[in-house]
């Protein structure tokens, strides 16, 4: 089956990378997992082999329905739709972990959406991302790569690059390098669902060279914070 460019399909096929991801995720029979874009089910089968409690898969490409429905496992729950627009609040049982090779063009909006469910019990994500996106998410304070999503993740937990992944590990091979990124959500669970918090972060980065006081006029800021720039923020 030909991969569709409009869906950003680059299927992970390297067994060594799959093994690295499974070892890193440390899955157990208590975990309910969400996979975004299961494709041909290669990662799906690896997750099910870890004896997880259940696995939700959200897939947009209806051409993959026969192949995915052919995976006979009562723990597998298939959902069809756009991952960015999907109503994740309807998932039962609700996942505590996300493991996915996600289409790179939806990386930022998808992670923002998933973070909203920290107060429902989502605590962990292991994601295959474009290397550039991985570097931005894990960028340190006071660096040019720093952006709102990275600051938000810092406020609720941590993110780190686990492994860099070359193009030949995918079919078709993307034109960019990739990386496996681990995100742990350990605190401030309600914060990720706050529209005000998201708005403040984005406004803070609207003009990177300006201080927070200038970008957030009309908002009362703690002493000393107004002179900082958004990229200087840390947890």
Residue ranges and their predicted role:
Residues 1-203:
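Catalytic cores of RNA-modifying enzymes
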């Amino acid at each position: 089956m030909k991969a569709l460019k409009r869906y950003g399909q680059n299927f992970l096929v390297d067994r060594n990378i799959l093994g690295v991801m499974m070892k890193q995720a440390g899955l157990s029979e208590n975990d309910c997992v969400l996979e975004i874009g299961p494709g041909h089910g290669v990662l799906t089968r690896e997750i099910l082999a870890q004896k997880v409690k259940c696995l939700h898969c959200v897939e947009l490409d209806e051409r993959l329905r026969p192949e995915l429905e052919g995976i006979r496992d009562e723990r597998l729950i298939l959902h069809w739709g756009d991952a960015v627009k999907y109503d994740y609040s309807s998932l039962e049982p609700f996942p505590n972990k996300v493991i996915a090779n996600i289409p790179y063009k939806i990386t930022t909006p998808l992670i923002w959406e998933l973070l909203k469910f920290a107060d429902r019990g989502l605590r962990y994500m292991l994601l295959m991302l474009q290397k550039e996106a991985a570097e931005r998410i894990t960028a340190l304070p006071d660096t040019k790569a720093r952006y709102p999503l990275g600051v938000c993740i810092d406020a609720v937990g941590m993110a780190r690059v686990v492994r860099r992944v070359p193009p030949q590990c995918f079919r078709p091979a993307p034109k960019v390098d990739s990386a496996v990124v681990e995100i742990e959500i350990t605190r401030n669970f309600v914060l990720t669902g706050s529209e005000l918090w998201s708005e403040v972060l984005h406004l803070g980065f609207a003009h990177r060279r300006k201080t927070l006081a200038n970008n957030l006029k009309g908002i009362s800021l703690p002493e000393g914070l107004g002179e900082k720039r958004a990229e200087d923020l840390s947890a």
